[in-house]
């Protein structure tokens, strides 16, 4: 590590800053050309030395003339093609010619890329400067508008000429559209679900419709014989789905209690003794079977334990 490593943070192998391969501006950099050709300011803000005032030693009284480089002329002078090519009989001569051609090619590419980089840098700086100026103008305009609104009162004509409501932004319009689509879909779903429940109730009640003469005679006999059993053949939710309770209990005074139990377990809000769409969905998803198995395991733990003990005894005897 050399003596000058301290200024690089005591790090070895640090490369110096890169320098441009073009020492002067090119002829395509119009911004520098216009700046050089523009008249110099005079007066207090002028540049230079007044008459009778000597300039400091080692400096120039007049600014040196800026020389612009034409990249094509520079390439023609520095990387010109060889005028005469010697016979390349030997392999060493061929290698030297190939290396010289590669050096010329790489130097030409370096000149072109450096000129393109300078032009791109100038365009980016101009674009960035315009953006910053525009943002500053908008900020100043906003501040001035707030100040003027604080110190003045809106006139009646100005108030009537402006809209009563603010227009929605594109984000707000998109959000409102999504909300409307959601509400429309939800209403359609609820209406469809209501129709399915009504159709299912009609299916249950249709079992009690009298459509034949034999059914009519049978029903008349039941009425005149003072039978106390309710005339319904509806599908029993408790016996067919949940497997706890029986039909007589469902048709007795405990119907409301059984319905509340079913609603609490199945998440249904229906107060009828017929099963609704939610129970059908639970049955298709096998949720009812899982609940029934859990209830059986809770109600009959002794039988399971006895069965296990019997199996253990049989294994021991064997």
Curated annotation (Swiss-Prot):
CDD domains: mS26_PET12 (cd23703)
Single GO MF annotation: structural constituent of ribosome
Main localization, broad class: mitochondrion
The UniProt record lists the keyword Ribonucleoprotein: yes
Superkingdom of source: Eukaryota
Biased composition (Low complexity): 300-318
Keyword line: Mitochondrion, Ribonucleoprotein, Ribosomal protein
Role this protein plays: Component of the mitochondrial ribosome (mitoribosome), a dedicated translation machinery responsible for the synthesis of mitochondrial genome-encoded proteins, including at least some of the essential transmembrane subunits of the mitochondrial respiratory chain. The mitoribosomes are attached to the mitochondrial inner membrane and translation products are cotranslationally integrated into the membrane.
Protein's name in the database: Small ribosomal subunit protein mS26
Species annotation: Saccharomyces cerevisiae (strain ATCC 204508 / S288c) (Baker's yeast)
């Amino acid at each position: 590590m050399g003596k000058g490593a301290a200024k690089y943070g005591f790090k070895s192998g640090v490369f110096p800053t890169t320098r441009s391969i073009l020492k002067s501006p090119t002829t395509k950099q119009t911004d520098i050309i216009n700046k050089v050709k523009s008249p110099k300011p005079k007066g207090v803000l002028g540049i230079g030395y007044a008459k009778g005032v000597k300039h400091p030693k080692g400096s120039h009284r007049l600014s040196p003339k800026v020389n612009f480089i034409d990249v094509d002329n520079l390439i023609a002078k520095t990387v010109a093609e060889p005028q005469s090519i010697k016979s390349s009989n030997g392999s060493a001569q061929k290698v030297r010619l190939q290396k010289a051609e590669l050096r010329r090619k790489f130097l030409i590419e370096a000149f072109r890329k450096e000129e393109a980089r300078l032009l791109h840098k100038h365009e980016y700086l101009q674009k960035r400067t315009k953006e910053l100026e525009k943002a500053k103008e908008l900020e100043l305009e906003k501040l001035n508008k707030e100040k003027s609104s604080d110190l003045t009162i809106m006139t009646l004509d100005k108030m009537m000429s402006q809209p009563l409501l603010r227009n929605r932004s594109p984000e707000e319009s998109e959000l409102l559209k999504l909300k409307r689509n959601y509400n429309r879909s939800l209403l359609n779903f609820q209406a469809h679900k209501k129709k399915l429940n009504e159709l299912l109730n009609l299916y249950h009640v249709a079992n009690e419709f009298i459509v034949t003469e034999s059914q009519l005679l049978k029903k008349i006999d039941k009425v005149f014989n003072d039978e106390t059993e309710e005339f319904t053949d509806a599908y029993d939710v408790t016996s067919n789905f949940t497997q706890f309770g029986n039909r007589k209990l469902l048709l007795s005074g405990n119907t409301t209690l059984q319905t509340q139990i079913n609603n609490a377990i199945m998440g249904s809000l229906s107060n009828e003794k017929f099963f609704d769409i939610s129970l059908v969905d639970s049955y298709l998803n096998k949720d009812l079977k899982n609940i029934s198995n859990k209830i059986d395991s809770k109600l009959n733990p002794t039988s399971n334990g006895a069965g296990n003990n019997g199996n253990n005894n049989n294994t021991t005897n064997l």
